[in-house]
Regions:
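Solvent-exposed serine/threonine-rich low-complexity stretches and specific carbohydrate-binding patches
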Residues: 89-112
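Short, surface-exposed beta-strand/strand-loop-strand elements in extracellular ectodomains
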Residues: 68-83
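Short, conserved beta-strand segments of beta-strand-rich sandwich/propeller modules, principally
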Residues: 58, 134-136
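Short, surface-exposed tryptophan/glycine-enriched loops
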Residues: 113-133
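Short beta-strand-plus-loop segments that form exposed binding edges in beta-rich domains
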Residues: 137-149
Length: 168
């Protein structure tokens, strides 16, 4: 059974809005299915905790709904290993062409609930794969679409090589 790692205290995983301000719970972006978008003007910061690092190879973002006004269009994803390190640019995106899909999910009683429209996209990370513990998704303000000062996100999936320390 899936459990959101940001809601399991012992995992050490944390999700926050980069500037501390936003609507909805930022941890929702790690849910298997998130029925609402989280909104922010700054971006999302994901910390895997002190025991894990990830060599990111691919990632998927999901946004709920069919209205693209607040969808991410121009943004970057960055990573770093430690709090004091500079952010490394992993990828930058402009005018993203999202794929519209229907996301089906099931209620507590096992009944299928009406499919929800969402937009998803998966990208690969090019170049040298370095280990990172913290990731952030940040809107590019210099190319922000007119009338969209905030951005929404319903889910993120990170793929790659996870490093777990040896506790011997």
């Amino acid at each position: 059974m899936w459990r959101n790692p940001a809601r399991v205290l012992s995992s050490g995983v944390k999700v926050t809005y980069c500037d501390g301000e936003g609507r909805e719970d930022p941890e929702n972006i790690l849910e298997y299915f998130n029925p609402v978008n989280s909104y922010t003007r700054s971006g999302w910061c994901l910390d895997l905790g002190k025991y894990y690092s990830l060599r990111l190879t691919d990632y998927t973002l999901r946004q709920r709904g069919s209205n693209s006004k607040n969808f991410l269009q121009n943004f970057k994803i960055q990573g770093r290993l430690n709090d004091d390190d500079e952010w490394s640019l992993l990828n930058r995106h402009y005018k993203v062409n999202w794929k519209l899909r229907e996301w089906s999910y099931y209620g507590k009683s096992g009944d299928k609930i009406k499919p929800v429209p969402c937009k998803t996209k998966t990208w690969s990370v090019e170049g040298e794969l370095k280990a990172h513990r913290q990731f952030q998704i940040v809107q590019l303000r210099d190319s922000m679409p007119t009338g969209a000062p905030q951005m929404s996100l319903a889910g993120i999936e990170l793929y790659g090589v996870l490093s777990v320390p040896d506790f011997d």
